[in-house]
Amino acid sequence: MTITTLSRQNIQALTPYQSARKLGGNGTIWLNANEYPTSPKFQLSGKDLNRYPEPQPQRVVQAYANYAGVSTENVLVTRGGDEGIELIIHTFCEPKQDAILFCPPTYGMYAVSAETAGVLSKTVPLTDDFQLNLPEIKNHLNDVKVVFVCSPNNPTGNLLKQSDILDLLQITAGKAIVVVDEAYIEFCPEASVINLLKNYPHLAIIRTLSKAFALAGLRCGFVLANPELIDILSKVIAPYPIPVPSADLAEQALRPANIATVQALTQELLSNRQWLAKALLVLHQVEKVYESEANYLLIKCQNGQAVFKALWEQGIILRDQNKTLHLQNCIRITVGTRNECEKVVEAIKEVK
């Protein structure tokens, strides 16, 4: 008997999520994790470090409720959006009995979180234009307790049709929780489904401070949902989920003055995205630049592996999507500073 064989069988078979940091690389330009290219500057108060944190940091809850336009009863603060995903699976799915459903190509943590919890996964691939295949989803809802969709979708960058999300909510009513992952919604706020919360008690929305707020290192996310759903998740969440320093910085980030700064910087980044998309389109190595509503672009290359490897060797770290369903020869590029974007274009231009 070894330590490994003592572990649960599903954990022994688990392929862990390959985060951008885990994949490593000796980069000088990091455009593989959809992080904001520069760090904000906040000052830690240093108060109450000798005390355990609040179960839910009330000033952060109130500040995010104000920002999102919901009641504090609709907000649960989590350790990044990923904890929200895990919480929902652990709360609603019986291991080895219930399933989640998601639609690849999409964010990899839905599958990993389910597998870690011993919960089954069902997949219904997106259509050729990366939209929901509603008839097939409807045919696969048996034993499904949670449906995950991502809009803007990672890694494709496109928005899902709100009419399709509405249809999904209707066909799952009384059967399953629908989770809409809005990690990138600050780049297209008009596309949020937050106004649907009042009419659909089985809707949950994942949010984060990791993307437009430039606080990926903070690990602060949110679940937005109706009070009954929030109350159930609150039974499962760890007693002290958000460290005092994280709550301190999150509260500062959600002050009106900083929100205005985030919105201005977001416009600058969207300008960089537009420039990068146009510059990539004229390169002979690039076959297609997909439309994006997020802070990254998905491109299809003649030889994606060659482009990825050539830039990796130059210290420009992108995200290879070649093994992702329907994304052969594709690469995801985080939109960085204008200087970083220019270096990416010049480097791809030199690939033979």
Swiss-Prot record:
Residues in the signal sequence: none
Reaction(s) catalysed (UniProt annotation): L-histidinol phosphate + 2-oxoglutarate = 3-(imidazol-4-yl)-2-oxopropyl phosphate + L-glutamate
Source species, domain of life: Bacteria
Gene3D superfamilies the record matches: Aspartate Aminotransferase, domain 1, Type I PLP-dependent aspartate aminotransferase-like (Major domain)
PROSITE patterns: AA_TRANSFER_CLASS_2 (PS00599)
Enzyme kind, highest EC tier: transferase
Gene Ontology MF terms in the entry: histidinol-phosphate transaminase activity; pyridoxal phosphate binding
Residue positions where N6-(pyridoxal phosphate)lysine is found in the record: 211
Record pathway: Amino-acid biosynthesis; L-histidine biosynthesis; L-histidine from 5-phospho-alpha-D-ribose 1-diphosphate: step 7/9
EC numbers for this chain: 2.6.1.9
GO biological process, one term: L-histidine biosynthetic process
Cofactor(s) required, per the database record: pyridoxal 5'-phosphate
Keyword tags: Amino-acid biosynthesis, Aminotransferase, Histidine biosynthesis, Pyridoxal phosphate, Transferase
Disulfide bonds: none
Family named by the database record: Belongs to the class-II pyridoxal-phosphate-dependent aminotransferase family. Histidinol-phosphate aminotransferase subfamily.
Subunit structure: Homodimer.
Protein name, as recorded: Histidinol-phosphate aminotransferase
